[in-house]
Design a protein with these regions (language model features):
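Rossmann-like dinucleotide-binding core of oxidoreductases
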Residues: 15-22, 26-28, 32, 37-49, ...
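Feature captures the FAD/FMN-dependent oxidoreductase FAD-binding
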Residues: 91-160, 336
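C-terminal active-site-capping segments
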Residues: 413, 417-507
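Core beta-strand elements of the Rossmann-like FAD/NAD(P) dinucleotide-binding domain
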Residues: 23, 142-151, 191-192, 345-354
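Glycine-/small-residue-rich beta->alpha transition segments that form the dinucleotide
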Residues: 127, 149-162, 183-185, 202-203, ...
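Beta1-alpha1 glycine-rich phosphate/pyrophosphate-binding loop at the start
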Residues: 23-27, 32-116, 223-224, 288-293
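Glycine/threonine-rich phosphate-binding loop and adjacent beta-strand/alpha-helix elements that clamp
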Residues: 358-426
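Short beta-strand to alpha-helix junction loop
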Residues: 87-105, 117, 199, 269-278, ...
Length: 507
């Protein structure tokens, strides 16, 4: 007979005798990853108690943080939304405010919002091998509060919420206008009739350009080099047809799978036939822009498709803004800032009232939380990642990170289900700790994110390591991971035990 979590071992999976502030699971973050984890963990382990610690004052995570004009999904909303809660709006590329509303409604529908402690910034987590529990320290209203839990799930993403990346631009202090980073967009910034320069060519920059152009006098996207852009319809015909023929949830799952397959096929085609994909994207740009437009200078990257993340432009909105004369792209290098704007190395000058530094993110593992084992601090970047969601020799800790080439939620949901599955397995055997162990066999290292984006290359030393063979190989392949999950050998390279069965772990 399989025991339920609370029946597994007397006192090990319930709050009896554990004292105030104890729960079975602490989830860090109330965005996509945290909400998914809460749903999946309790779906499979309904008796487990949990608390979500969210540093912001609202649900949404990234989708509450980013408030810049035009913020939206950069992949299909049907793969970004949860498989268990259908996306019901018509658009397949969703605005940030609607994603935030969807997350809030989902958390409320399943009672997840009742478990959230807002304004709780997790600073540290220390594992105690004498009791097989984590002590999690959170900052709330300037004071520190401690929680204890058997398990910790980090759904806090992969980048620094406090500050984005801005290069040291020469003379930036002399600029007389306003400098804004999209990660901290001022609510009261009025850009109507202003001249705006957006520095960057990534997803944020290409989202900002057409949106700002609706009200600004002139918007210029200044890039050092081009990025591949792919245009897709904001309102998909497949979703509309599926909703007419199928019940709501079935339609959602069908469109979700269709979107995941098309994204995977296009990625594979980009890898296998880069010249063909490059030609297709170039033809789209030529057909969408005015005759004679210098497509090769501004929209022909030097690298192959998907060597860096490709940027989505719904209904070719960026090309349309350029064609309408409301926006432009300049490919050049910055020499220095001056009072009136940006002097270029080519000798040109971009006048500006507002400069937006869409120059990237700063990555960090586990939300910047200090992790220690029996009081000995560890560095996550020294550890290999196990099945993309646990750290080598770190017990009862899970970390959710999405794909670089597909929607975040595809891996987030696999991670949440794998976590729930492991917790159920542990409960059935009465285990109180589990950790992946590589042993002494040498392992070839590789970056856990195999993409050449600047924000990744700048921060390789901030992320855990990937190996080159399972289960330590971090892949960017949803379907391979989904198959692995289905046939998962849950005890592969894992050490299980009960409280006080082993010596304390060293860092």
């Amino acid at each position: 007979m399989t025991a339920t979590p609370r029946e597994a071992v007397n006192g090990l999976y319930n709050t009896n005798g554990q004292g105030d502030g104890y729960v079975d699971v602490i989830i860090v973050g109330a965005g996509i990853s945290g909400i998914d984890a809460a749903y999946r963990i309790t779906e499979r382990n309904p008796n487990l108690t949990y608390t979500i610690l969210e540093r912001r004052s609202r649900i949404g995570g990234t989708w509450d943080l980013f408030r810049y004009p035009g913020v939206r999904s950069d992949s299909s909303i049907f793969t970004l939304s949860f498989p268990f809660e259908p996306w019901t709006r018509e658009e397949g590329v969703a605005d940030g405010v609607h994603i935030r509303e969807y997350l809030t409604a989902t958390a409320h529908k399943y009672g997840i919002d009742r478990h959230i402690q807002f304004d709780s910034h997790v600073r540290a987590a220390d594992w105690d091998s004498a009791t097989d529990t984590w002590t999690v320290t959170a900052e709330q209203d300037g004071a520190r509060k401690q929680y204890r839990a058997r398990f910790v799930f980090f759904g806090s993403g992969y980048y620094n919420y406090d500050e984005g990346y801005t290069p040291d631009f020469p003379g930036i202090e002399h600029f007389a206008g306003t400098v804004v980073h999209p990660q901290h967009w001022p609510e009261d910034l009025d850009y109507t009739g202003k001249k705006i320069v957006v520095i960057g060519s990534g997803a944020t920059a290409v989202t900002l350009l057409p949106s700002l152009a609706e009200r600004a006098k002139k918007v210029t996207m200044l890039q050092r080099s081009p990025t591949y852009l792919i245009s897709a319809s904001k309102y998909g015909r497949v979703a509309a047809a599926a909703r007419k023929l199928l019940p709501r949830k079935a339609a959602h799952l069908v469109v979700r799978m269709y979107s995941a397959i098309t994204e995977a096929v296009f990625f594979a085609l980009s890898r296998k036939a880069p010249d063909l994909v490059r030609w297709l994207l170039r033809r789209k740009a030529i057909n969408s822009l005015p005759p004679g437009y210098d497509v090769d200078t501004h929209f022909k990257p030097r690298y192959n498709p998907w060597d860096q993340r490709m940027c989505l432009i719904p209904d070719a909105d960026l090309y349309n803004a350029i064609s309408a004369g409301r926006a432009e792209v300049v490919t050049d290098h910055i020499d220095h800032f001056d009072t009136g704007g940006i002097a270029l190395k080519s000798g040109g000058h971009l006048d500006a009232d507002i400069i937006v530094t869409a120059t990237g993110l700063q990555l960090q593992a586990l939300g910047g939380t200090t992790i220690s084992l029996d009081g000995v601090e560890i560095n996550p970047s020294d550890r290999f990642v196990y099945k993309a969601h646990m750290l080598e020799d770190v017990p009862n800790l899970f970390w959710c990170v999405g794909y670089t080439n597909a929607s975040w939620t595809l891996r987030a949901d696999i991670t949440a289900r794998a976590t729930a599955k492991l917790l159920a397995h542990m409960a059935s055997y009465g285990y109180t700790h589990a950790y992946p162990h590589r042993g002494g066999e040498p392992m070839t290292e590789k970056p856990s994110w195999d993409i050449n984006a600047g924000y990744v290359l700048r921060s390789l030393d901030a992320l855990p390591k990937s190996g080159t063979r399972r289960p330590w190989n971090v892949r960017q392949n949803y379907f391979a991971d989904a198959i692995d999950y289905r046939f998962d050998r849950i005890e592969e390279a894992m050490v299980f035990g009960r409280v006080a069965d082993r010596a304390p772990l060293a860092g």
